[in-house]
């Protein structure tokens, strides 16, 4: 079943997920240098929580994401959670008011006016461009994980970070816990999958941290070979710093409503 899920998502039309159409070439500018952070808040009543940091040095970025409470399994196997930095819109996270069709789920497309299209795919290996946006084979999986990777950051995403419109979004809801109106609905990205499989579960607007940044508190980034989960450690100092970013994000989101 998981192989079918992977195949379906890999074949999903790129434009449907909201790709920017730009390549993954590294940027030459360093105007986005600094450390950005956010508290990841639940979307679609996912019950999940998380933190994210992006440290930009020159054209390289080191991204760290910690999550817990996500959907754990799909068809009996570890649930893959595609994740991205979305760009080019308001730089905010959607609310249930953005559920345009009233089915009880804010799907990826309905969330785009808030967070925009994919600028960077936060994959475990390989391509980090928008075209890798639905590749679940390189997505972290399970209900809790710590993700960390350093890679060349494209210019469009650097522009978004510098302009305050970069948003981290983690996708994938448990289909069994969704509203009845959406339970039988297929994804508007990959019609062979349930809508919940590609809907956003976590979201956070990235804000630049004070000079010097903060300790991430990551003590382990071990990815389980069977469960797809990883240990998660949230340092107190980092939580405080990320909390400041959350307050800003919440104010920005409230301004939309």
Pin down the residues of each PLM region:
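N-terminal leader/targeting pre-sequences
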Residues: 2-7, 12-253
């Amino acid at each position: 079943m998981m192989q079918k899920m992977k195949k379906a998502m890999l074949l999903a039309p790129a434009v449907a997920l909201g790709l920017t159409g730009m390549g993954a070439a590294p940027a030459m500018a360093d105007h986005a240098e600094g450390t950005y952070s956010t508290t990841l808040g639940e979307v679609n009543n996912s019950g999940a929580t998380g933190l994210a940091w992006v440290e930009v040095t020159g054209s390289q970025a080191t991204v760290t994401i910690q999550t817990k409470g996500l959907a754990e399994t799909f068809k009996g196997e570890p649930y893959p959670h595609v994740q991205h930095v979305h760009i080019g819109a308001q730089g905010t996270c959607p609310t249930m008011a953005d559920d345009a069709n009233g089915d009880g789920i804010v799907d990826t497309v309905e969330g785009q006016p808030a967070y925009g299209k994919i600028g960077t795919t936060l994959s475990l290996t390989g391509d980090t461009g928008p075209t890798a946006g639905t590749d679940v084979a390189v997505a972290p999986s399970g209900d809790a994980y710590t993700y960390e990777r350093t890679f060349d950051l494209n210019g469009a995403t650097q522009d978004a970070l510098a302009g305050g419109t970069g948003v981290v979004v983690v996708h994938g809801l448990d289909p069994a816990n969704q509203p009845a109106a959406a339970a039988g609905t297929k994804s508007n990205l990959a019609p062979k999958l349930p809508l919940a499989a590609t809907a956003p579960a976590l979201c956070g607007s990235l804000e630049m941290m004070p000079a010097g940044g903060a300790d991430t508190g990551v003590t382990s980034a071990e990815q389980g070979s069977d469960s797809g989960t990883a240990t998660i450690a949230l340092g107190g100092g980092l939580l405080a710093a990320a909390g400041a970013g959350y307050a800003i994000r919440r104010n920005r989101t409230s301004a939309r409503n």
